[in-house]
Curated annotation (Swiss-Prot):
Protein name listed in UniProt: Hydroxyacylglutathione hydrolase
GO molecular function: hydroxyacylglutathione hydrolase activity; metal ion binding
Record's cofactor remark: Binds 2 Zn(2+) ions per subunit.
One of the protein's GO biological processes: methylglyoxal catabolic process to D-lactate via S-lactoyl-glutathione
Cross-referenced HAMAP family: Glyoxalase_2
Entry similarity comment: Belongs to the metallo-beta-lactamase superfamily. Glyoxalase II family.
Oligomer status and interactors: Monomer.
Annotated residues for binding of Zn(2+) 2: 57-58, 127, 165
Superkingdom per UniProt: Bacteria
Keyword Hydrolase: yes
Reaction(s) the record says it catalyses: an S-(2-hydroxyacyl)glutathione + H2O = a 2-hydroxy carboxylate + glutathione + H(+)
Gene that encodes the chain: gloB
Pathway: Secondary metabolite metabolism; methylglyoxal degradation; (R)-lactate from methylglyoxal: step 2/2
Methyltransferase keyword on record: no
Length: 251
């Protein structure tokens, strides 16, 4: 399998997974034009679309793509049924696409129906986890999002996190505002800044590395706990997550 990315809008990535024959699955096509261009350039043969949630920048291109490739199956949670999904999926489902088995995880938080698609090593996580951050809570609760992130955090170390936005630099600046002396975060900041100066993407990321630099995955880390304790004593990791998320919302 080969992983490809298509830039869209200001900071979205549309992921395309292809096999050796050029058959492909398209993840969260927020707009059709760049996808159609890439399909023509690479002579890909689309078989399916994966939708993680209902927001327009993830589903806006579905109906136009179906006009060009009506044979495609569009997988998505119930909240995407009116956005073009033809095959509804839910937590624990498994589907077979391009000869590979994908497992579905419900990851409520950003939206209530958000799902992720996993076929080792690829995780298509939409707007649940970003490098150095996580999605805003538009519909779900901090507790729901925390549990969703813990599902992702339990995956194998070499999982490739394929998130949908280039938010890494801003996220790492936030992380440094909380833990300014953290060596892993500082090293990652230098790397990410260099990539972005060259207009290169920072994704995908490896889960093992993400655990070191993403504060939202470090809610039981003693350095972070000590920093939070300077402002408030929070005994539960979920409460520390909620504190972090509120800080990020106003950063």
């Amino acid at each position: 399998m080969n992983l490809n990315s298509i830039p869209a809008f200001q900071d979205n990535y549309i992921w395309v997974l292809t096999n050796d024959e050029g058959r492909c699955v398209i993840v969260d096509p927020g707009e059709a034009a760049p996808v159609l261009k890439a399909i023509a350039e690479h002579k890909w043969m689309p078989e399916a679309i994966f939708l993680t949630h209902h927001h327009h920048d993830h589903v806006g291109g579905v109906k136009e793509l179906l006009q060009h490739f009506p044979q495609m199956t569009v997988y998505g949670p119930a909240e995407t049924q009116d956005k073009g999904a033809t095959h509804l999926v839910d937590d624990g489902d498994t589907i077979r696409v391009l000869g590979e088995k994908f497992t579905l995880f419900a990851t409520p938080g950003h939206t209530l129906g958000h799902v992720c698609y996993f076929s080792h090593p690829y995780l298509f996580c939409g707007d649940t986890l970003f490098s150095g951050g996580c999605g805003r809570l538009f519909e779900g609760t901090p507790s729901q999002m925390y549990q969703s992130l813990m599902k992702i955090n339990s995956l194998p170390d070499d999982t490739l996190i394929c998130c949908a936005h280039e938010y890494t630099l801003a996220n790492i600046k936030f992380a440094l505002s909380i833990l300014p002396h953290d060596s892993f975060i500082n090293e990652y900041y230098r790397k990410v800044k260099e990539l972005r100066v060259k207009k290169q993407m920072t994704l995908p990321v490896i889960l093992k590395n993400e655990r070191k630099i993403n504060l939202f995955l470090r809610t039981e880390d003693i350095d972070l706990i000590n920093e939070i304790n300077k402002e408030t004593i929070l005994q539960q990791p979920e409460a520390r997550f909620a504190w972090l998320r509120s800080k990020k919302d106003t950063f």
